[in-house]
């Protein structure tokens, strides 16, 4: 029996708190909050949950923006900043770090492989 929540097959062998974290947009604290609201013990394995309890989890997860909706929201926020010409948008466009990190000697991950200077 595969448990499906928010379009994601969550692992049935794991505890409810851990299994919920397989959904994009749900971390540890939000998983605990969802379990508390659904009145489910976070240490209960997903395979031991009844269908009613799974429905309660689905309802609670449905209250949050997760998976595709969250990904779309984040990409639209980045696109909006780029269109506005905001500092963060410019940094996104140029593929540079956004949050004030130094780029003279580091930031190789963000900048990519070194490009040779052609003469």
Swiss-Prot record:
GO terms for cellular component: cytosol; small ribosomal subunit. GO terms for biological process: translation. Residues 93-119 are annotated as: Disordered. InterPro entries: Rbsml_uS13_C, Ribosomal_uS13, Ribosomal_uS13-like_H2TH, Ribosomal_uS13_bac-type, Ribosomal_uS13_CS. Coiled coil: none annotated. Belongs to the universal ribosomal protein uS13 family. This is Small ribosomal subunit protein uS13. It comes from Coxiella burnetii (strain RSA 493 / Nine Mile phase I).
């Amino acid at each position: 029996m595969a448990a499906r929540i928010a379009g994601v097959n969550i692992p049935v062998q794991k505890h409810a708190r851990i299994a919920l974290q397989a959904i994009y947009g749900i971390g540890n604290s939000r998983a605990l909050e969802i379990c508390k609201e659904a009145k489910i013990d976070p240490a209960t394995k997903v395979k031991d949950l009844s269908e009613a309890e799974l429905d309660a989890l689905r309802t609670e997860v449905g209250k949050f923006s997760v998976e595709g909706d969250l990904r779309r929201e984040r990409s639209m926020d980045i696109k909006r900043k780029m269109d506005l010409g905001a500092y963060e948008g410019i940094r996104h466009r140029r593929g540079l770090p956004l949050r004030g990190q130094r780029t003279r000697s580091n930031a190789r991950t963000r900048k990519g492989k070194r490009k040779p200077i052609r003469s």
